[in-house]
Amino acid sequence: MASAEETILLVEDDQNDVFFLQYAFQEAGIKNPLQVAADGQQVIDYLQGQGPYADRSRYPFPCLVLLDLKLPVKMGLDVLRWVRSQPQLQNLLVLVLTSSSNMRDVDEAYRLGARAFLVKPVSTDKRIELARAIKQFWLELNEPPSLGPGGPE
């Protein structure tokens, strides 16, 4: 179970989606801080604590990553491939949250180690319902593995 102080990292380039997801999280009662990375390279820099993300008091390591697939600079599947190639990130919870429902994307995301594949809802009510489901399962019920020795601090 994640504590309400643990950060969620949303990887999303569409500012409208960021706004609506933030609203849905608020309505669902998710208290966790939400950090946003707008492209694939930013999420890699964030997870490595590099560049502007070096200050871990300002940019804490996330308990959960919500990853869009269609991103500028580096696509979501490439980010997922990179995450799973890093020994210290093997247990990081990465959920794909995308507008694609293409079965090839679904299969590839799971093959690369996504823990879930969620299609972004269009309506506000469905977004709030999704946020509640994320809260209940991933933040309240699920016991995530530790990041293990040598994992991020």
Give the location of each predicted region:
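Residue-level signal for the "D+5" position in two-component response regulator receiver
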Residues: V36, L71-K74, V79
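Alpha4 helix (beta4-alpha4-beta5 surface) of REC/receiver domains from two-component response regulators
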Residues: S3, F19-Y23, L77-D78, S101-L118, ...
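Non-catalytic signal-transmission and effector/linker regions of two-component phosphorelay proteins
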Residues: M1-L9, Q15-Q35, Q41-I44, Q48, ...
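Short amphipathic alpha-helix used as the core "switch/output" element in two-component signaling
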Residues: P52-D55, L77-Q90
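Active-site residues of response regulator receiver
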Residues: L67-L69, T98
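Conserved phosphate-binding and hydrolysis motifs of nucleotide-dependent enzymes
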Residues: D13, D68, G76
